[in-house]
UniProtKB/Swiss-Prot annotation:
A motif (Nuclear localization signal 2 (NLS2)) lies at residues 184-247. The lineage of its organism: Viruses, Riboviria, Orthornavirae, Negarnaviricota, Polyploviricotina. This is Polymerase acidic protein. The gene is PA. GO terms for molecular function: endonuclease activity; metal ion binding; RNA binding. Gene3D superfamilies: Influenza RNA-dependent RNA polymerase subunit PA, endonuclease domain. Binds 2 manganese ions per subunit. It is an enzyme of class 3 (hydrolase). It is found in: Host cytoplasm; Host nucleus. It comes from the Viruses.
Amino acid sequence: MEDFVRQCFNPMIVELAEKAMKEYGEDLKIETNKFAAICTHLEVCFMYSDFHFINEQGESIIVEPEDPNALLKHRFEIIEGRDRTMAWTVVNSICNTTGAEKPKFLPDLYDYKENRFIEIGVTRREVHIYYLEKANKIKSEKTHIHIFSFTGEEMATKADYTLDEESRARIKTRLFTIRQEMASRGLWDSFRQSERGEETIEERFEITGTMRRLADQSLPPNFSCLENFRAYVDGFEPNGYIEGKLSQMSKEVNARIEPFLKTTPRPIRLPDGPPCSQRSKFLLMDALKLSIEDPSHEGEGIPLYDAIKCMRTFFGWKEPYVVKPHEKGINPNYLLSWKQVLAELQDIENEEKIPRTKNMKKTSQLKWALGENMAPEKVDFDDCKDISDLKQYDSDEPELRSLSSWIQNEFNKACELTDSIWIELDEIGEDVAPIEHIASMRRNYFTAEVSHCRATEYIMKGVYINTALLNASCAAMDDFQLIPMISKCRTKEGRRKTNLYGFIIKGRSHLRNDTDVVNFVSMEFSLTDPRLEPHKWEKYCVLEIGDMLLRSAIGQVSRPMFLYVRTNGTSKIKMKWGMEMRRCLLQSLQQIESMIEAESSVKEKDMTKEFFENRSETWPIGESPKGVEEGSIGKVCRTLLAKSVFNSLYASPQLEGFSAESRKLLLIVQALRDNLEPGTFDLGGLYEAIEECLINDPWVLLNASWFNSFLTHALR
């Protein structure tokens, strides 16, 4: 039957049916007839709605699929096939906008022409029997019932069949075809006999007669009657039961379930060692932009043209020198690399026509910085398998690092508002259905809260850099291409702005596999003096390259301008994910949406407007040593976005492991707070699994510190 369903029905219908069965905890491998029934019901609901629209005069019209009038209002709103929360949101929205009475049970459709909810039934039995069952269950004259059978019969409330003859005939023909197809495969009889009546759930209903006798006979051993078994189930305490099952599994297994109390958990141990260092692919809060407003120069939009135009806005260049050397690098090479960039940009400006791309001369300093000819030679295994002492080269264990305050400062800065607008969402046409209206409203409110956020700047910067680097890696594999680090935004007044953060020079990039690495040197402008937090800049060589005049309360002040230079690397798969950083917006929007849904289901109406416009209400943002931090809904949006962005910027195996393992401990603590009396075994092993992920990654260490704050306040 399962194979038949997958062949016979549209994949979208099959997927919706799978979700519905999963939501109700039913196994489609076992309940195959139910699977077929759900697919049939979904298809009938969709066919009922298909091609029916309402024109500007409010009349119901039929439009064939090839007709271009796509913006006509659908006559029917489809409720069936949505998950329960979303379905109730749609129903509540319809009731609020049309004044319709709210139904007790979820209906299948809403008819905008007749202004009524519709319950669709598809039966393998007599239509009038099924109709009565539906009517008894719904107990509402406001919901219209329409029943179809596989034999071509139909029945509807007050013989009002809603649709025209032809539309109903299409549904009946399809049902008849499904029946024929099932019969030809020998599936029909089983399907026909498996239909149960409409189920109504009653509290502790009495079982009598034959059913009672069968219930008593089918109990597990040691139970004489149903009442005894019910009493046992109601008073069942799981402690001890799981140990028994485990001991049967293997002589090696010896698990004692320990009660998890408020005093049980200890804080996660963070590693000791030197402070952790910055490891993002580009500077975050310390970045400095050279910008042009309302760009209209020749070649505007071509990165190299934009970069040269931005460079011309700064007049404070001076002879560069190293102010913070890289401990292990050849620092003069970094200095020479920057001088080479300046010289080659000057050469371009002297040319008659500026080229679209710039490949750097392969000088000794760039060859060193980009690791040219540094990779160990690869030898075929067959040529060396006879060597007696052949072994994998030793690699050192990573050095443990401690949490440093700079990463919390980075996160705080990412949550802040800037004075620029970083995203503009495309127009997606007019809303037709209520659910689209709600979705657009939520999207617009959310965008307003995060469009000025610094985390959004990081998204656009990340998307640009990764796209440019991947393009160059594929288009100029052997060249040391100069790639400007650019972003675009709008000022508060709506003027366009192009920003230059610095440059990347790409090394050789013959990337065959997803994980093959391309080396690059990044050179980024900053006003941050690296000597204030030298541990943060361990991987960088920092040059002083100029003096910048800044406006301040006391007039103009001169500040030294620095260039942060380092060798770095990335891979095709990392660049691919970097290009998709806009997904962070979607993830945080979905988290906000689940908060709105929870609020809406309590109030039984869509709470989007109140949620965003009630400025007096505060929401929990996170834990800190002081306690639960709270803030406005805008602050919540920006914090969730910043977390998502940092998960992308600082993605690592350490983060994957910590997230997966700490989640288990979080669920146990949550169960304790919900008074579910959780029990655990091998809690020490869980702590070990969490703590082995705490090595040197700044973002993971910060998350572990936040987790400890949560433990402290959650278990008070």
